[in-house]
A protein has these predicted regions:
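Short amphipathic alpha-helical heptad-repeat segments
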Residues: 4-12
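Accessory alpha-helical DNA-binding modules that contact the DNA backbone or grooves
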Residues: 6, 16, 24-198, 202-238, ...
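Short acidic-aromatic active-site loops that bind/stabilize oxyanions
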Residues: 159, 331-332
Length: 559
């Protein structure tokens, strides 16, 4: 198959971008950029043209013409291959992020060591991009938004991204249809970490046989929260401007609860129940009783281990149970708010305590704290504790787990922290054997209080390194180390599927926001939802301890 013009132009543009990225001769990469721009207007197949003919095209010089001929014959040209060989593949994807050109990508690469879109997204979430000269908060947010959009195009979405649109959609329907019922079923009903499709169950008969014209009328009445959804009659699906896809099922009012139960649960849950529609007893609780089974809250209806290790609804963690906020970053490292601002906001939320856990000295990309800065922060915390009593700020650190499993401070420094969150931030491409050696060594370190985001995953962006979760949890149980449920909705790490095993082993789990600004505390809502899916009990949630209980917990560990 012949090379088309678009492919040739794309190759020339890539060369121009990579040449600028690597700071080659500016005259040369500008010539390629100009040539590519002008060639976009050419309709005649470029692969048919000789070099002499190409030179007649405005903006096409000898080097560009030679590259076109070479590419048309071989689907490659030497100059581009040379640059590709010295360019991390992730940088090419970064060049495709809206708002980023070669110069900015180079600055991010050189200053922060970031060479993938996934790492760039994480850096924006942690307010690290603003550390690079020329990048302000507005630019950082625009890049974050652009990356979010590109991820959304993959067809799967974080629960946190979908939730506000889903909730506003139902509220708008309530205004239009009055007393009808509308509930999202499936993954959304179970509050899954990732949503692929929204499925709405409704009693509004207007949706039966609805056409695009009828939907337009309903949307006009419901306002922008409905108008953002476009109905495609050919597929029977609604599509949101942000990329979400939704199907709608209509049922009679009398059948709504029964259908919600069946559609809200995963197939595996219904199979474990041996459930048939004839088993419906008029409500969920009576249906479980009739089957001789304990009631299971909607979020746990996954067919995992909800019947093997049942947890009473009253024992599951709730957001209102949380008394403290652990694992938070301030302006000492890569956070947006000061220690005092973080503390005051935690107090406003009704929390009893806060743990400041800024990045440690190895994390140069995040302005990790050298020892003198640690001691400076200690002094500030002590002063604030006198002013804010009975609220208490604990002196913590998020200490990097080095490649050999050591933490990155000497014991005499580690011993001065109230708590230490041990986390992996570098060399993530590990085998399971290496990852286990590294994490087990950190867990066995007597100064480790909490194992932070155990797998290092970023949902929909980066797979976590492989672990034997049961062995990790066993080690935590043996060493009195708690496990973090990182509540950042892009992490939710530890995965909910392993929480029940932690409960069996008596391992405390801490729902931590990993907040880089005070508003990040609210991410704990997503941590609680994920915890509930795994059967996280209030009694084994570390930051559900009140202040006195938490102080006693830390004191006991230090003995």
């Amino acid at each position: 198959m012949a090379v088309d013009n678009h492919e040739i132009v794309k190759a020339l543009q890539l060369y121009a971008s990579l040449a600028e990225l690597h700071e080659e001769n500016p005259f040369k990469y500008k010539a390629f950029a100009s040539g590519a721009f002008n060639l976009r207007k050419i309709k005649e197949p470029l692969f048919d043209l000789q070099e002499s003919q190409l030179l007649l095209i405005p903006g096409v010089g000898k080097s560009v013409a030679k590259a076109i001929v070479e590419y048309a014959e071989t689907r490659r040209f030497q100059a581009l291959e040379g640059l590709l060989s010295v360019t991390p593949g992730g940088l090419i994807a970064m060049l495709g992020v809206k708002g980023l050109g070669p110069k900015k990508v180079r600055m991010i690469w050189q200053d922060l060591g970031i060479d993938t879109v996934e790492e760039l997204f994480d850096a924006c979430r942690q307010n690290r991009l603003v550390e690079v000269s020329g990048f302000g908060y507005k630019t950082q947010q625009s890049i974050l938004d652009a990356i979010s959009f590109s991820f959304a195009a993959r067809g799967k979405f974080h629960l946190a991204r979908v939730m506000p649109y889903a909730e506003s959609f139902v509220k708008a329907l309530n205004l239009v249809f009055g007393d009808e019922k509308h509930v999202f079923t499936g993954e959304y009903y179970r509050k899954s970490d990732v949503i692929e499709r929204l499925s709405l169950l409704t009693t509004a008969m207007e949706f039966s046989g609805m056409g695009e014209g009828e939907w337009a009328e309903v949307a006009a009445e419901g306002g922008e929260d409905l108008q953002a959804w476009h109905y495609h009659e050919s597929s029977g699906l609604w599509k949101h401007e942000q990329g979400f896809v939704m199907d709608i099922q209509v049922v009679p009012f009398a059948d709504f609860e029964r259908e919600l139960f069946a559609l809200g649960a995963a197939d595996g849950h219904l199979e474990k129940m041996n459930y048939q529609s004839a088993d419906w007893q008029g409500n969920e609780r009576d249906t479980y009783v009739a089957k001789g089974l304990p009631y299971v809250v909607p979020s746990r209806r996954e067919g995992h281990r909800e019947f093997d290790r049942p947890v009473a609804e009253s024992d599951l963690i709730q957001f209102a149970d949380l008394k403290g906020v652990l694992h938070n970053h301030t302006t000492y490292s890569d956070g947006l708010n000061s220690v005092e601002e973080m503390a005051l906001y935690a107090m406003e939320m009704g929390m009893e305590y806060l743990a400041i856990c800024d990045h440690s000295k190895t994390a140069g990309y995040a302005r990790g704290l050298q020892v003198e800065r640690v001691l400076q922060q200690f002094e500030e915390i002590e002063t604030l504790n006198q002013q804010l009593w009975p609220f208490k700020i604990f002196k913590g650190i998020e200490s990097d787990i080095l490649s050999n499993g050591d933490l990155d401070y000497e014991p005499e420094i580690l011993s001065q922290f109230d708590l230490v969150v041990a986390s992996v931030h570098s060399n993530l491409g590990m085998t399971e054997e290496k990852a286990m050696q590294r994490l087990l060594a950190a867990i066995e370190n007597p100064y480790t209080t909490l194992l932070g985001h155990p797998t290092g995953r970023l949902l929909l962006m980066r797979e976590g390194y492989p672990l034997d979760h049961h062995k990790i949890i066993d080690a935590c149980a043996a060493n009195g180390v708690a496990i973090e449920l990182n509540a950042n909705p892009y992490r939710l790490d530890i995965d909910w599927r392993y929480i029940d095993y932690a409960m069996e082993k008596g391992v405390m789990v801490s729902v931590n926001p990993d907040a880089h600004e005070k508003m990040g505390y609210w991410d704990m809502h997503f941590g609680v939802l994920s915890g509930q899916k795994g059967g996280l009990q209030k009694s084994l949630t570390l930051n559900a301890l009140n202040l006195v209980e938490f102080e006693n917990y830390l004191a006991k560990r230090k003995k």
